[in-house]
Amino acid sequence: MSENAMLRHGAFSWCELMTADVEAAKRFYTELLGWTTEEVPGMSYTLVKTGDTGIGGIMAAPPQATGAPPQWGIYVTVDDVDATARKAQALGATTIVPLTDIPNVGRFYTFQDPQGAVISIITYRMQGASL
């Protein structure tokens, strides 16, 4: 099995759209880019795929985001999310979403860098697995 480059430390590995209108977003992006979508059982989450490969997701924005424009978020793979989160904080990052476990996926942390950009880091449960 070949290594998935997106699972290497420092690689962009996942994108998610938070929007007030999930159905409209699904229609737009499937028509525009040829993506396919698949509902994730037991979650309010739509998996976005190109071919057989999951590349991201679409989900409803939380109530506290009412009035905010839809936005894409990106995840960067790291070898140790806890250590990298501590390092980000030491370098001046502000926590947006604290360290959080995603069942059967991994653990992530979302922060705002000192310049104001928001990004998420993630360590996948099985770093050698395909996405």
Residue ranges and their predicted role:
Residues 1-8, 12-20, 47-49, 64-87, 91-131:
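Vicinal oxygen chelate
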